[in-house]
Amino acid sequence: MEEFDIREATPEDAEKIIAYLAQVGGETDYLSFGKEGLPISAEEEEKFIQNINKEEHSVLYVVWKNGEIIGDASLSGFSRRMSHRAEFGISVVKSEWGQGIGSALLQKCIMYAKEHAIELINLEVRSDNIRAIHVYEKYSFRKIGTSPAYYKMDGTYYDFDLMVLDLRRERR
């Protein structure tokens, strides 16, 4: 297996991240966007990364292999009364599925959460994304509900499962 490197995103990564998002969006229907990527310019992405890097409870990781981004994951924290929570998001290029990259990203985000006093990690996953759900369950995420017709694509509705990892149990 070829080596990959996970690190925090920097503003200099913005253009590569935008290209990556267009690629990964075109490879799967499990994301909220398609091959058009996200409607954001390189300058807007740079500012987004700068803001994330300033926030105490948020992080954006990118996975590099052979000079290209092949995955990303984020924790988006909240303020005040919800500062003990963060929302998790992840994507990996299809050619790298099953290579442990998603698990490595998830481990990195869990470690970040523990180091930054984040007690609950929430995520939303399409209910038929069995591969992702299996990985989340392996890391002790539990399903707390289902949001029906959460997502609509080409006239078809898809349910999403809401899952949470409770890190408070580990602190007791």
Where would I find each of the regions flagged by the language model?
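Acetyl-CoA-dependent GNAT
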Residues: 25, 37-94, 106-107, 166-170
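A short beta-loop-alpha structural element at the N-terminal edge
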Residues: 5-19
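Conserved catalytic-core motifs of GNAT/GCN5-like acyltransferases
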Residues: 122-125, 137-159
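Active-site acidic-Proline motif in GNAT/NAT acetyltransferases
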Residues: 90-95, 99, 127-128
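Conserved acetyl-CoA-binding loop-helix of GNAT-fold acetyltransferases
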Residues: 98-111, 115, 134-138
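Glycine-rich phosphate/pyrophosphate-binding loop shared by adenosine-nucleotide-utilizing enzymes
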Residues: 2-4, 66-72, 158
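Helix-loop element at the rim of GNAT/NAT acetyltransferase active sites that forms part
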Residues: 19-36
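Conserved GNAT acetyl-CoA-binding A-motif
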Residues: 113-124
